[in-house]
Amino acid sequence: MILSYSRNLYPQSTGEKIVMGIDWSPNSQKLGVLTADHSLYLFNDQGERQDKIGLRSTEVKSSNKDFIPLCGTFSPCSTLFVVGQSDKVAYIFRLGQLWTDKKSIVARIPMDDAVTAVSWPLSEATSELSPIIFGTASGNLYLYSFQSKSIQAFVSSACFASLASSKTTTADNQATPLSPMSSPIIKILPIPSMPQCFVAVAESGLAVYVDIKTQQLRAAARHSKAVTTACMIAQKTSHGRHYLVLADVMCKVTVYAVETSAALCVCNIKTPQNIPFTASTASPSGGGCIVANASGLHFLTLVNSQPVTVSYEASSSAVTVYQDSGKGFLPQITSIAWRPDVSVLTVGTSLGSVDNFTPTIGSYRYCGAEVVNSAPNRATINIPRFNGSKRFAAGSIDLHASMSSELRTVKAFPKHDFTSFVQNPSGYKSTNIYLLGIGDSSIVIYSLNDDTINEFRYNASLTDKFFFDVGACRTMVISNTLGEFTVCYLTTQSDPGCTFYKVDIYATMRGCVAPHASVISCYPIYEDAAGSLNRISKIRTVCLGEERTDVLVTDLMPPDMCDDFSDPIVVLFRTKTSRAVDWLFFGPSGNAVLLRDISGGVSILNITDYSITQLSTSVGNGVVQWADPFDVIVGQESPDAPLYVWYNPTDIEDAPEILQPPVPVDNESWSFSYVKSNPNNFSKITAGHVKNISVQAIMTTPSGRQTSVSLDTNLLLFNLLLDKHDILGACQLLSALQDNNARVTNRNLWQKLCSVALDSFNFIVASRCYAALGDLPLSITAREIHERVQNAKDGEAGMTHDRMNLYCQAQIALLNSDLDKYDGLMMSCGRIDEVLTLYKELNLYSRAEKICPESMINTLRTEAIQWLINSGQMTTAGMLLAQRGDVRGALDLLIQDRSYLSAFELAKRAMTSSADPSLAPIIELLIGKLEDSHHYSQAAVLCTLGSGRNHERALALFRKSHAFDEALELARQHLPHECLPIEREWAEWLFQTGQYDKATQHYLECMNQEMAVESAFRANNFKLVESLLMDIPAAETNAHLCFRLAEMKYISGDAAGAATWLLKADQPLLGLSAFICAGKFDEAIQFIRSNLPRQSYRELLVHEAKRIISLGSAPSNNPVQEKTKTLTSSGVFASSSGESSEKQNVQSFLNRMESLSHIRGVYSAIELLKLAGLYEDVADILQGNSMWDELYSFAKEHAASFSNYPDILRMVADAKRVKGDKKSCATILEELCMELYGLSGSSSGSSGGMGAATDGYTRLRTQASHLIQARRDVLLEASSMYCDLFMYLEAIRLCKRCGDMDALTDVCLLWVSSNANRSLLIQQLKQLNIIEPTLTKAADRGMWDVCTELSEYCPDPEAVRCDLFWRRGRKLEIEGRLKEAEEFYAKAGKHQEIVGMYLDTGKFEDAQQAAMEMTSNFERERAMRSIRESKARVLASEGKWREAEAEFIELGLVEDIISIYRSNQMWQDALRVAKEHGDSVLVENLSESYVKHDKLRSGLGTSASAFEPGAKADLGDGSGLAGRTKQHGSDVQTARSILEAGSSAGLRKMLMSAARSGSDVLFEVVLHRCAELASMVLNNDIQDSSIVEDIAIISPSIHNFEEIGSPHERVMSLAVAYLSKGVPLSVTTGTESKGTISLIISDVCNREQLLLVCRGVLSLAFVESEYVNRITKQETHGDGIFCRLRSILLSYRNMLLNTVRGTKAAETDKVNFIPGDQELSRCFEATHLIIQLAKLFIGAKTISSMRDIVLVSSSLVRYCDLLPVDRCFVVAGESCKQFVEISNGNSNAKVMEARTQYLNQCCVFLNKFIDLHEEISNHSRNLERIDISDLTGSGIPWTAQVPVNLYLSKSRADEVRAFILELTMDESTTTTQELPREPCPFGCGKPIWIGACSCINCRQVSPICAVTGCHVINPNTHMLPSSRACQICGCYARPAPWNSLITKSKNCPVCEEVGFPIGK
């Protein structure tokens, strides 16, 4: 804020004119200044001095001047001023409203001491009622009542001072005299928001909060120093707080919270020392305050209220305030005051000067005008040349939000109009412009057109929108985003006590879909009809509801004006439109609303009858508006389109008038703009100048031209004429319009005119209207009435005006056919004769009889009867005769008119009253007529009346009419023997007509219980049926009835009753189903326990559970039929009779129960089994439905109830892994590991525990040999998965809990290798004390940098480093990097290892060189001896026996050469050497061995295997079959003996015998059986009988075995299941068990038999759909047949590497995965590539992934001799084709090159497939006729066999053939019929196929890449990679694809262990 000097009000002077007080009046119009020279100066709001009042001393007439005024203030009404003086008196002066009013002293108020403070707040309704508060120098507070002119002591200084030590007190209503302890009251500060409260501030620093109403006092502040001045900052918001500002003698300013009396902050003001603050005042806006002292004014700003922050603005508070005013010195400021509107700050000084300062907060420009914020709640808009307001100074508009503390923003509506107005204020003309000032608590509005200001309290938000003139002038709507809007009316009535006009705020509407001015319209309804009083009673509002098709019409009233019997919102009606509404607007009369929908349609809403009429479907696309002030609508759809004028829009029959627009000028179209009416106000139209009315539609062109089209004034005037009661003129107007055919008038106008004419008794005009409406009779009648009225007026001079009015009203009633009213009115007129004459003419004798005299009644009746007979109304005539007593004549007329029923009633009355014999003939005639007309009951009644009663005839007639009640009553009285037949007949009739409930009782009456039960059934009266069945004895039909009753009870919801009766119907199982279908599982379990045998308890509940599950999965059209047919067909629900009809009834009932039941699905079945305690069956169901989460939770909850709990955890973990939820899988595996740990602990304690553990963990035994190994496998799996998720802490915790140090080191090693901060992790390893085991394992894995770091933390780092060097040398030696190995051996000091390394590789020269470098002679000699020994062994291996023998003998190694001779079966040479160089013992032992060998050889020759006639290949470990047999004992059978006896004993007994003989024997027997199964497949000789036992033994362990359709696949699935899953314990032990015996592949494995199994699996042929959809998915999930075969081969390889033969083969064979075995290696490679291709198929198809698919599928072609040949070629060809398609358009050079290569490869493969398909389709036995020249030298074998079935169907093969033909014929595609080639990677230069792994030129072979299947030879170095890709399985791979795969999956694709990237 900036204070700028404004003007001087009173100049400075010498003497005693010091300013003692300043106060502004509340209305900001008057300023009062008290000076020390005993004067009160008065100034106006412009600062002009108006008056001076001399003050009086204690005595009014005394001239004593020994006093000074100390304080003063205005009254709330601004007409009174009160002054407090030092001479213990106060005066009240009356100033008046105007300056010219007389000034006088109103009251003189004596006090006990000097008056130091005064306040006059508006605490009551008026100033006179509000008390004045005085504070004195003695510290007392007084209340003065202006009304009663009395003063009262309120609070004494003692009471005041007591609050210094207490929190609250009560006013004592006393005063204490001045004492040394007294403290003067210096300020009394009223609280604006609480008029009854104020704060009194004492000079001592104590401030007290006082409540006048409750007389309660509490401390508002306890300041420690004396206070010099005080003020209060009061925020004007509704929740604003009050802050007390105290300035003390130490020049410190402190802010207190009045509500809490807490000190909030201290303001630091830099002023000269010891200059106290003398005055202060708070800003009326609530934004801050000003304190003053000799150094100037200091402005304090309330920055924030949460928390409270008051800052000192130095820039707004400097002493330059007076320097700017031109004064050269700074007088002492004694008093300051704000003007209430915050526009002026008035300052008084010690020199008597009074100055005004103008505060300015800031300025900005808005719409071209400058907006100056002179105060926080005041804004001045400067508009030059604007002088149109009487309220403001020329050139400005002042917006003052007096109810707000801050004016937030200024807005103009409409904004563009205000912008134009600012530019040219004098020349701009607009409808209405409003300026809006939005404050924090109120809104101030200025209307430029009306020059009015309105202000009202409203807390506007930033999202609120304002709309003006909504439907009516000065109507404002405020809306928000919540669908709410508030209607305000800006009145022109002054608000009492305020300078602004009032604003009527109406109730807030809610639920509007889009509160906008376009969909809200208002219409003010005034208290008087003309609206001249300008008092609005309510506002009618039409708006949208919750949808855009919902229109709501309401009447709104201000809520504060409503009483208990009125509602501020009255909903008149709500309606729906067919389309969404775009905008709506009230008509000028408020009786109709114009609606436009979003499609351009225009409708009218009639407020009077709440109807909606559509005017047009398209006019709304243009301009549509009301022709104000008429309810006429004018619209134009588009420029130059006709104008549509609806003169009566609410009339649905009124067609619009079409007016053509003017002819276009200069190709400019005419558009409708607005309607111009003269006059424009309906109230100005008088009867005198009706003809001068003109209404024109103004048309404009784009260039600004205007023209007018006149509307039909006559039609506009019609309603005006009716309103002016000019009926004849209106009739002439309509007649003229109709006669001139100017416009076709509709019926409604004539009807309206007719109604008004009748109301005015103008019958001649009504006659004209009826004629126009086409009702000629009424027109004639109206004319006759007109004549009668005229005659009545002329003929009877005595008829008064009132009687004439009654006569006219009677005629109108006659026209309206209201004869009752006509009678009454005519009788009132005394014209009864005229009425009787009219009634006779109209034959209305009954009405005439009512009003005629008594003498004329008989005559009228006779005339009426005769007229009735003549007119054929004999029935009515007969009734009249009967009334006159002529019964016979009446009956005769009624019979003639065939009114037999009326005649019956008449005859019945006559015969009942008296028996007249003369009536007998006519009665008999009537009975015959009634019987002929089928009125039997009436005829029977007549038969029972009179003297000649005929009861038999009456009974027959009653029974014929089914009136059995009357017939039974008659029979009981007169014919008792007919009662029982009547009851039976009645019951049958009721049964036939469907009245079963009544029929039941009658059947019981006639003693037919069976039909009674049937009727009760059909009446759904089950209680009665139940009671009847209880009484019926047991019979064959009883069960059927019980069954029906049960069915009905179930349908009615009584499941328990249904089960009870089903039990009686011998259907207990159906009763069980009833309970279950009703969801009453507890009752079902209790029922089955009570009524069914115990042994079937579980089976029945499981069966019911499966039925419930089937219901949940059944199709919607027939959900239960297929699921329940098994029950009925097997007789489960059938009775003992077994009849088909009863089965159908049972089936129907069961189907109905299931259809009505909500119990279905897996969860219901689980709930049933859980309640029954069948937990294992629950687990089976959860497993079968793949509900793994539920299975895990349930099993964990009931773990003690499961014998196979570990199995369940294993299954859940596998399912989580398949879903990709590794974290959950790892957690479950951890729990499984802990479970197995407990089992392992219990197994180590006792043998019984081991058996339980084995039975409880059957599935895991297929993966390990015993429970301990199984636990370790799970531990490794769980920890590996944790490591994959980087959850190393969890993995370490698990390993520690299991106590597995090996696994713990593995995890730590992975953690170390994955984290860059190794030092921190190594410290953790040290804490775990596993550094050395981790180092050892890191060395085994080649992690040498980790080993180096770990070695530093070992006790002997140097020794550890030497060991690491040795280990690294050893690893390099294994890899063939001998030189590097020699270097590390040397660093380790292992020179002997160097020699041994070179000896192992046959490099004797390098070995000798290494030996010569040894420093020790002993070591050197030993090394040389080792070299000689190695050379000798080499000579022996090369067959140079003699040279080797000589060398061995020379070295003294006689036993070694003998052993070599012995191993090669050179027994003679061995004996010779032993005899020549050995001792006798050696010779003797050798001779015995020779003899045993001969015996053993002869024994084996007679019992050789069918697959290997000779002995088993020597694995180099020296343990043969005979040795193993000897070890087991003589009582154990061998595999061969078991196999020989197996053909007769059967497979099951053979496996049982093998299991008893040991694991190796069992493996041999099982492998032999698997080989037999494979031979069946390879020879295509499969007999179902030959595999029956295999299916019974092993098929339960195969998932979905029944779904396997191919017999070949079924057989090989059995074989693979034997080897992978083991043999069930139930087979080997003969007892029931779920466990299995795992098979361990050992050295007894027959390689040939295993090869047969591999070939059998690989030869399986599939069709395309099965291979893609089933086989591929199974292999991806890891549970396919190829995955299991790969696991078997990996186990065989591991076993082989643990033997001597395998170790030696691995050292020399780097190509084959299974060392030394090319065939098994090829089988393994083919199996692995099938799995790899399946995993690639499921991924996203990108160029990179498609390249991998092409490489793998092409590599599989190399194994077409093992795999189905057609599948190999077509899969490879299709993969190439897809790559070509997906890479089409790619401009990458490498992609384009690959595309060309693969296109050629695709052509070759698919061509070959077509040839194969044709040969196979022709049933060729071989493929020799196919040309394979294009495959020559590719490495693709062509010894393939014809597959069992074709991979592709004929249609798919035709598609391939068409593609090849199209590719061949396409000239734009250059393809060659040859495979793409590349230079030989081995370096010979021969071009070979890019997919080959061997070269026919250089005979070199490469291992395959585990990722792509291609060779792994580096084309640059022509060598194998320096190291294998996987250090665990030893597979090779190309670096790029391997690293890419490891990045994604983290695992080796072969062994699925953790893999690491490799270098190039």
Swiss-Prot record:
Keywords, comma-separated and alphabetical: Cell projection, Cilium, Cilium biogenesis/degradation, Cytoplasm, Cytoskeleton, Flagellum, Repeat, TPR repeat, WD repeat
Gene Ontology cellular-component annotations: 9+2 motile cilium; axoneme; ciliary basal body; ciliary pocket collar; ciliary tip; intraciliary transport particle B
Listed SUPFAM superfamilies: WD40 repeat-like (SSF50978)
Entry-linked InterPro entries: TPR-like_helical_dom_sf, WD40/YVTN_repeat-like_dom_sf, WD40_repeat_dom_sf
Superkingdom of source: Eukaryota
Listed GO biological process terms: cilium assembly; intraciliary transport; intraciliary transport involved in cilium assembly
Main location: other
Task performed by this protein: Component of the intraflagellar transport complex B (IFT-B) involved in flagellar assembly.
Family: Belongs to the IFT172 family.
Protein name as it appears in the record: Intraflagellar transport protein 172
